[in-house]
């Protein structure tokens, strides 16, 4: 509904390695949003009561990869929700993002890209009710280390993902206009996450680094 809070689920690292970008990103979301925002940081946990406890993450490329497929159930299959990775800065009202209509026959929308069968699942908008009775209950698959990639294949092969404007997931500024900036190249992420052990590189676009620095300073 138009007056409901904007529900945003953010996949992040487990032990505070991304604390700086978490703070800057959350600030940017709340600053730009015209409605109340309900933010959930999804991270690995030892809390057995948590919805995010006990997931098999052996084959995940990040500490949170598979969590995105449980978000509609976490919302009780009601309303709409947004998923994003943590390595982002928001630059446009997320109420506009969550209010995008999910096309008939689609479970969600994501931008087109070169990975994952032609979709980039780092920003997703869900119509949670559409997932009920289509995707099995989380408890039946969260211990399966292959589930994350099975879901990607399922959604791509059955054409269940609609198209999201690329400006809502601009990969290091690969769009002329940026609504949601995604620092996708890990070696150049300006907050220097502790978990990254590869060769650090300077970001090629100083103006994009300044966007992060401004959001962090404001937060």
Located regions from the model:
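Active-site-proximal specificity loops/subdomain of glycosyltransferases
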Residues: 37-74
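GT-A fold catalytic core of metal-dependent nucleotide-sugar glycosyltransferases
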Residues: 67-116, 123-131
